[in-house]
């Protein structure tokens, strides 16, 4: 089973409903091939009517992250959720370790005069260690400058104070997502990208 982790803000009713909708659409499309973890569904550590224990929350989610194949980071909102940003960092580091492990493995095999191509060596490494973890980001903010009229907005910002039309994102968090995967701007686009990744890993 391909392990998928859905991260994002979950503290207000709107967020929980959105997460539930997203999880439903994911399960409808690829549910038979994945084990989807949605933190808000894990009431053993995320029942907010009870006293939260930071150790239990950290280890509960961290242990899931260590076995996650595809990590989905929902980063909508004025500021990407701090917990989600931390998890993006953990997944980015896991991917870097995976890539370093592949490089070390290929280097050792070449040193031992193994006559395999680089693609064959990578296939062997994947058989032993699984595929590299991937991050999929989801941001549906309508202020995406890629799809708006830049010239008119730039003119307004040039002549008026505090008229920035753009949403701000922490570029470190955004970079972690883009370097280690892809960013989707709608639920449908996200589910399409996820389906491609799942089909590659089945």
Predicted feature residues:
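Conserved catalytic or regulatory cores that recognize and/or transform ribose-phosphate-containing ligands
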Residues: 1-202
């Amino acid at each position: 089973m391909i392990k998928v982790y859905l991260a994002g803000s979950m503290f207000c009713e709107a967020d929980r409903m959105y997460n539930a909708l997203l999880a439903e659409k994911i399960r409808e499309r690829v549910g038979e091939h994945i084990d989807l973890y949605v933190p808000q569904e894990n009431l053993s550590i995320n029942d907010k009517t009870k006293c939260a224990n930071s150790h239990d929350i950290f280890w509960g989610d961290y242990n899931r992250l260590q076995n996650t194949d595809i990590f989905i980071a929902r980063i909508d909102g004025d500021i990407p959720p701090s917990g989600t940003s931390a998890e993006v960092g953990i997944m980015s580091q896991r991917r870097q370790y995976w890539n370093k492990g592949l490089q070390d493995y290929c280097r050792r095999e070449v040193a031992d005069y193994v006559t395999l191509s680089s693609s064959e060596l990578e296939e062997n490494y994947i058989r032993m260690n699984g595929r590299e973890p991937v991050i999929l980001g989801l941001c549906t903010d309508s202020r995406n400058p890629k799809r708006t009229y830049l010239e008119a907005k730039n003119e307004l910002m040039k002549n008026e104070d505090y008229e920035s039309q753009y949403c701000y994102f922490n570029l470190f968090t955004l970079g972690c997502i883009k370097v280690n995967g892809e960013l989707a701007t709608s639920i449908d686009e996200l589910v399409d990208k996820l389906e491609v990744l799942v089909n590659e890993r089945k």
